[in-house]
Structures are given as structure tokens and as C-alpha cells.
From Swiss-Prot:
Tree of life domain: Eukaryota
Pfam families attached to this UniProt entry: Mastoparan (PF08249)
Organism: Vespa magnifica (Hornet)
Family assignment from sequence similarity: Belongs to the MCD family. Mastoparan subfamily.
Designated name of the protein: Mastoparan-like peptide 12c
Primary location: secreted
Chain's role: Shows mast cell degranulation and antimicrobial activities against the Gram-negative bacteria E.coli ATCC 25922 (MIC=6.0 ug/ml), the Gram-positive bacteria S.aureus ATCC 2592 (MIC=3.0 ug/ml) and the fungus C.albicans ATCC 2002 (MIC=12 ug/ml). Exhibits little hemolytic activity against washed human erythrocytes. Its mast cell degranulation activity may be related to the activation of G-protein coupled receptors in mast cells as well as interaction with other proteins located in cell endosomal membranes in the mast cells.
Signal peptide positions on this chain: 1-7
Annotated region described as Disordered, given as residue ranges: 1-22
Sequence positions bearing Leucine amide: L39
Repeat keyword on record: yes
Pro-piece positions: 8-25
GO molecular function, one term: toxin activity
Swiss-Prot/TrEMBL GO biological process terms: defense response to bacterium; defense response to fungus; innate immune response; killing of cells of another organism
């Protein structure tokens, strides 16, 4: 898990459904995290 995900559990797509979290924001953060992993 990334430091960002640990710092903001609501933004972690692996944390499961969260009524307080915006699904679109979660998707954007997940894509950004994946891009960071792929690009190093």
C-alpha cells in the first residue's frame, strides 16, 4: 500500500466501498497511483 493510501484510507480503492468517498475521485487516485508504479 502506498503512503498516500495509508494517509487517506478513504482514497484507497482496496479499502472497499466508502459512502463518504467520491467514486470518481477514487478512480482518479487509483489511476494516478498505478501510473506512478508503472513510471517508477
Amino acid at each position: 500500500m502506498s503512503a498516500e493510501a495509508l494517509a487517506d484510507p478513504k482514497a484507497d480503492p482496496l479499502a472497499g466501498p466508502n459512502p463518504d468517498a467520491d467514486p470518481e475521485a477514487i478512480n482518479l487516485k487509483a489511476i494516478a497511483a498505478l501510473a506512478k508504479k508503472l513510471l517508477g
